[in-house]
Swiss-Prot record:
Renumbered ranges of motif Unconventional nuclear localization signal: 1-18
Oligomeric form and interacting partners: Homomultimerizes to form the nucleocapsid. May bind host exportin-1/XPO1. Binds to viral genomic RNA. Protein-RNA contacts are mediated by a combination of electrostatic interactions between positively charged residues and the phosphate backbone and planar interactions between aromatic side chains and bases.
Taxonomic source organism: Influenza A virus (strain A/Malaysia:Malaya/302/1954 H1N1)
GO MF annotation terms: RNA binding; structural molecule activity
GO BP terms in the entry: symbiont entry into host cell; viral penetration into host nucleus
Functional summary from the UniProt entry: Encapsidates the negative strand viral RNA, protecting it from nucleases. The encapsidated genomic RNA is termed the ribonucleoprotein (RNP) and serves as template for transcription and replication. The RNP needs to be localized in the host nucleus to start an infectious cycle, but is too large to diffuse through the nuclear pore complex. NP comprises at least 2 nuclear localization signals that are responsible for the active RNP import into the nucleus through cellular importin alpha/beta pathway.
Basic and acidic residues bias: start-end ranges: 8-21
Protein origin, superkingdom: Viruses
Keyword Ribonucleoprotein found: yes
Protein name from the UniProt record: Nucleoprotein
Any matching Pfam family: Flu_NP
Lineage: Viruses, Riboviria, Orthornavirae, Negarnaviricota, Polyploviricotina
Annotated stretches, region: Disordered: 1-21
GO cellular component: helical viral capsid; host cell; host cell nucleus; ribonucleoprotein complex; viral nucleocapsid
Entry's localization field: Virion; Host nucleus
Length: 498
């Protein structure tokens, strides 16, 4: 899809690169991974973690969060200007778990942010290495997407819980740059824009003065990012209308919600990247693997191969199922929270079940949870096959957007049928005459009505054996037509905002 204006691949966005060829991209992504790995090794040394403790995903999350917090300039500045009781703006830390006398103990550590920044830069040849920071943000975002269903956030902005498959990246920080924007779903962008418009409605000065000018530039930039995710001319034209509005208000909110609904059938293009926890990269670097020299890609076989050979552990609460915890993390590592469960199951080689049937809570452990009963177990993150990550939304005939899957935002470029009940979705569009009635709306509705369920997405694309590194022999799985496997639908997963 070159029509996004910028013809940079996702690896280039990931590494802020100029135009690079494939080898250079693989090297620069590898360099980023090396840096994360070296940083992680150094932090494990500082914290005196054993090999097992260093491979504990909860410790990995704490260490990742510390470095992200150390580089969060806006928040650091805010904390210094608004000192709050008991928070030292110059320090960062979190829970580190250690094995003492055959029991898990929680230890709260605190470090100077300056010191963490020094260790990070040292691991990254003196650079700030923003790409590596963004990579960790996307890993946290993918984990959140897999763990929580954001119904409440959707309802608050006037959207419908059925739009949860559009919410990829909804917890990514604003500062996540081009790589972050690439992985945000249509619903996430719509939600950010609606929040902004609502502030403008409630606060007269939001669009005014010097600050208002910056706000306006941010608004238009977000509109352009969202426009670039749509694949049909009518959807894009509507985005132009929203962007050019003199004084964005309820009409724009209505248009945006209409566009979000339309994206359930006319899928947007959203990137998927396999971002792994730092405790996977650390041991790989420690074992002497040179990611920069070997090259690495976030959208090919590399993450699968890395996970095949990694040992990662997790703390397990008394009534949690370790296999279910493994599924949660497997999905996060492969950015598969919104993928069809039939496709995920085939690739993983074991059945992937919906969120509501998983006996597991999130990966993070709250500070008030009792450690006495905590066990730990190995996470099973291996796969039977591998597949290429997609960003097309499943619409293979780009000339006229064919239908994508309704409750799904595809992750893998694998052929699948579209067993969707279009009537339920189309019902959402009747009698919604608020906002504007325009030719564009009529055109979008017409396209959705003519979208054919019989068409398959990703025609001829398949999965590959792990020995097939060059993706030479695609295996096209055949799926049971009867039901589309949505991870969240009809489900009561925990809320992210709790």
């Amino acid at each position: 899809m070159a029509s996004q204006g910028t013809k940079r691949s996702y690896e280039q966005m990931e590494t802020d690169g100029e135009r690079q060829n494939a080898t250079e991209i693989r090297a620069s992504v590898g360099k980023m991974i090396d840096g994360i790995g070296r940083f992680y090794i150094q932090m494990c040394t500082e914290l005196k973690l054993s090999d097992y403790e260093g491979r504990l995903i909860q410790n990995s999350l704490t260490i990742e969060r510390m470095v992200l917090s150390a580089f969060d300039e806006r928040r650091n500045k805010y904390l210094e200007e608004h000192p709050s009781a008991g928070k030292d703006p110059k320090k960062t830390g979190g829970p580190i778990y250690k094995r003492v006398d055959r029991k898990w103990m929680r230890e709260l550590v605190l470090y100077d942010k300056e010191e963490i920044r020094r260790i990070w830069r040292q691991a990254n040849n003196g650079d700030d290495a923003t790409a590596g920071l963004t990579h960790m943000m996307i890993w946290h975002s993918n984990l959140n997407d897999t763990t929580y269903q954001r119904t409440r956030a959707l309802v608050r902005t006037g959207m419908d819980p059925r739009m949860c498959s559009l919410m990829q990246g909804s917890t990514l920080p604003r500062r996540s740059g081009a790589a972050g924007a690439a992985v945000k779903g249509v619903g996430t962008m719509v939600m950010e824009l609606i929040r902004m418009i609502k502030r403008g409605i409630n606060d007269r000065n939001f669009w005014r003065g010097e600050n208002g000018r910056k706000t306006r530039i941010a608004y238009e930039r977000m509109c352009n990012i969202l426009k670039g995710k749509f694949q049909t001319a009518a959807q894009r034209a509507m985005m132009d209308q929203v962007r050019e509005s003199r004084n964005p208000g309820n009409a724009e909110i209505e248009d945006l919600i209409f566009l979000a609904r339309s994206a359930l059938i006319l899928r947007g293009s959203v990137a998927h990247k396999s971002c792994l926890p730092a405790c996977v990269y650390g041991p790989a670097v420690a074992s002497g693997y040179d990611f920069e020299k070997e090259g690495y890609s976030l959208v090919g076989i590399d993450p699968f191969k890395l996970l095949q050979n990694s040992q990662v552990y997790s703390l397990i609460r008394p009534n949690e199922n370790p296999a279910h915890k493994s599924q949660l993390v497997w999905m996060a590592c492969n950015s598969a929270a919104f993928e069809d469960l039939r496709v995920s199951s085939f690739i993983r080689g074991t059945k992937v079940i919906p969120r509501g049937k998983l006996s597991t809570r999130g990966v993070q452990i709250a500070s008030n949870e009792n450690m006495d009963t905590m066990e730990s177990s190995t996470l099973e993150l291996r796969s039977r096959y591998w597949a290429i990550r997609t960003r097309s939304g499943g619409n293979t005939n780009q000339q006229r957007a064919s239908a994508g899957q309704i409750s799904i935002q595809p992750t893998f470029s694998v052929q699948r049928n579209l067993p969707f009940d279009k009537t339920t979705i189309m019902a959402a569009f009747t009698g919604n005459a608020e906002g504007r009635t325009s030719d564009m709306r009529a055109e979008i509705i017409r396209m959705m009505e003519s979208a054919k369920p019989e068409e398959v997405s990703f025609q001829g694309r398949g999965v590959f054996e792990l020995s097939d590194e060059k993706a030479a022999n695609p295996i096209v799985p055949s799926f049971d037509m009867s039901n589309e496997g949505s991870y969240f639908f009809g489900d009561n997963a925990e809320e992210y905002d709790n």
